[in-house]
UniProtKB/Swiss-Prot annotation:
Its EC number is 3.5.1.5. This is Urease subunit alpha 2. It holds the Pfam family Urease_alpha. Gene3D superfamilies: Metal-dependent hydrolases, Urease, subunit C, domain 1. CDD domains: Urease_alpha. Pathway: Nitrogen metabolism; urea degradation; CO(2) and NH(3) from urea (urease route): step 1/1. GO terms for molecular function: nickel cation binding; urease activity. It comes from Psychrobacter cryohalolentis (strain ATCC BAA-1226 / DSM 17306 / VKM B-2378 / K5).
Length: 611
């Protein structure tokens, strides 16, 4: 037995089938377009690794007819698409014919998973009888059918208030597989701020989440003017620090926190001073001293210097994000926010100063501008602000609702020069995204990056998660296109299925009602220990914190953080010169007035949640 000669194989069959029939059997291929849920966003398949020799989208090298598919009378059978290779030579799991949607490209491929990581992306099959097989299938291989499905990396929510452990399940079922933030439960400090303060609480939360099927990292409290209290939190296991105005985000605290972060290579996240008590925006920017920092909800109502926190977006060292309560701007956004804000920040409607504080944060002009800044790639990330005004299960939904609203209001989004340069440097293929192509690939990559690769880069975990690339942790989400972004088909953690919609367990098959999301085998404690990651600082790992606490999850260090700049944000690196009129709240980016109308109707909404 030996590898088949591709030249000989090319002559074995010349039968052709209609493109529609092909898509029904194997999913869309190069040039086909797919609608995302009920939005007006259309992706186009850029190339197809399952049916091209040498992985090139060249019409002269097509090898259609060798696709693999599982099922009765289909390809993946002994002696056909399944080889005789031993387990160590084949993948543990193959996802067949999936449409990968990633910042790195929108393309068709088979995906191999081995020991919890993505071990290959290419062409699966039996190398003894099929040409150009890069991912051998054997008796040790499980198959997940990706035909007609979209595959993405698991989402990353980088703004979590750990108020309730049930958030983790809700987030997982929405397609989020990594949660970064702080908290200790429904204490007032956690209800308002994303801090896990001190070694005792950090250790307690690390132990409490050790059996939860989610990658997790905790932020310590950064609001202190001397280094030692910050150092002890980093060495206790924090992945970084959070500065929050409710604890006092003074220039001294900011400078001190960033100085320690520089020494320990961890990230600092900040919620700036809404009341401008300890200084104005320029005071805060000055305290940054050109050091990289993740500015939480750099937008209209999340909190921060009123009314001009949006100006921070123009700084090259600032890595800005939005939270989802203001995403996108709708006719209900303003009315919803006042009560939410009062509860979240322990304010009283009976105290005039508290009401004034809340009202100062809610400005329709800056919320509207936030939509456009997201679409321009000036705001780099999206997150939830879970149970602290944000909805933990709606990061992905709100991201794509914003993208759809911006297409409706701003039209087609063509690649900008920075994105072309970025893709050239990364050897990423640009699809035809001119106004005549009819696809939204560029906009799709821009918005997908906001909750996948960009928060991973920002927090020093992009070696492990954040994209669908060779060698990364197999945190994957499989979607039916009609339900993309709303209800996943499968959530895969570290190569095992952790959650899925499942019917009555007593039924004769898996589909009878009631169908709802249930935990699968990959979410139970002994498997969580191999499929999920706890992130810590290198200093904590060096001190053996994980061993001292008896943690069972995979432990990984955050790293390569302090040199990150806005230009490193994939598809979201625009640094405009920002101006905010202090009287009218009008927002300008590079001299352009940013304004848009609130949406009256949204996709991915009620029709998906009737039952």
């Amino acid at each position: 037995m030996g590898v088949v000669d591709p030249k000989t194989s090319q002559n074995t069959s010349k039968k052709r089938i209609d493109r529609r029939i092909y898509a029904e059997h194997f999913g869309p291929t190069t040039g086909d377009k797919v609608r995302l849920a009920d939005t007006n966003l259309w992706l186009e398949v850029e190339y197809d690794l399952t049916s091209h020799i040498d992985h090139q989208p060249d019409i002269d090298s097509v090898n259609i007819g060798e696709e693999v598919k599982f099922g009765g009378g289909k390809v993946i059978r002994d002696g056909m698409g399944q080889s005789q290779l031993l387990g160590e030579q084949v993948a543990d799991t193959i996802i067949t014919n999936a449409l990968i949607v990633d910042y790195s490209g929108i393309y068709k491929a088979d995906i191999a998973i081995k020991e919890g990581r993505i071990s290959g992306i290419g062409k699966a099959g039996n190398p003894d009888i099929q040409p150009n097989v890069t991912l051998p299938i054997g008796a040790a291989t499980e198959i997940i059918a990706g035909e007609g499905k979209i595959l993405t990396a698991g989402g990353i929510d980088s703004h979590i208030h750990f108020i309730a452990p049930q958030q983790c399940e809700t987030a997982l079922m929405s397609g989020v597989t990594t949660m970064l933030g702080g908290g200790t439960g429904p204490a007032e400090g956690t209800l308002a701020t994303t801090c896990t303060p001190g070694a005792y609480h950090i250790h307690s939360m690390l132990k409490a989440t050790d059996a939860i099927p989610m990658n997790i990292g905790f932020l310590g409290k950064g609001n202190v003017s001397l280094p030692a209290p910050i150092v002890e939190q980093i060495e206790a296991g924090a992945i970084g620090l959070k500065l929050h105005e409710d604890w006092g985000s003074t220039p001294k605290a900011i400078d001190n926190c960033l100085s320690v972060a520089e020494e320990y290579d961890v990230q600092v996240a900040i919620h700036t001073d809404t009341l401008n008590e300890s200084g104005y925006l320029d005071s805060t920017l000055g305290a940054f001293k050109d050091r990289c920092i993740h500015t939480f909800h750099t937008e209209g109502a999340g909190g921060g210097h009123a009314p001009d926190i949006l100006k921070a977006i123009g700084e090259t060292n600032v890595l800005p994000s939005s939270t989802n309560p203001t995403r996108p701007f709708t006719i209900n956004t303003i009315d919803e926010h006042l009560d939410m804000l009062m509860v979240c920040h322990h304010l009283s409607p009976a105290i005039a100063e508290d009401v004034a504080f809340a009202e100062s944060r809610i400005r329709k002009e800056t919320i509207a501008a936030e939509d456009i800044l997201q679409d321009m790639g000036a705001i780099s990330m999206m997150s939830s602000d879970s149970q602290a005004m944000g909805r933990v299960g709606e990061v992905i939904i709100r991201t794509w609702q914003t993208a759809d609203k911006m297409k409706a209001q701003r039209g087609h989004l063509a690649p900008d020069q920075s994105a072309k340069t970025e893709q050239s440097l990364d050897n990423i293929m640009l699809s035809p995204t001119d106004s005549d192509s009819g696809n939204d690939n560029f906009r799709i990559k821009r918005y997908l990056a906001k909750y996948t690769i960009n928060p991973a880069i920002t927090h020093g975990i992009s070696d492990e998660v954040g994209s669908l690339e060779l060698g990364k942790w197999a945190d994957l989400v499989l979607w039916s296109p009609a339900f993309f972004g709303v209800k996943p088909d499968l959530i895969i953690k570290g190569g095992l299925i952790a959650a899925a919609p499942m019917g009555d367990p007593n039924a004769s098959i898996s589909t009878p009602q009631p169908v709802h999301y249930r935990s699968m085998f990959g979410s139970f404690p002994k498997t969580v220990a191999q499929t999920c990651i706890t992130f810590m600082s290198s200093a904590a790992i060096d001190k053996g914190v994980d061993r001292q606490l008896g943690l069972e999850k995979v432990i990984k260090a955050v790293h390569n953080i302090r040199k990150v700049r806005k230009q490193d944000m994939k598809f979201n690196s625009y640094c405009p010169q920002m101006e905010v009129n202090p009287e009218t709240y009008e927002v300008y980016a590079d001299g352009e007035l940013l304004t848009c109308e609130p949406a009256e109707h949204l996709p991915m909404a009620q029709r998906y949640f009737l039952f």
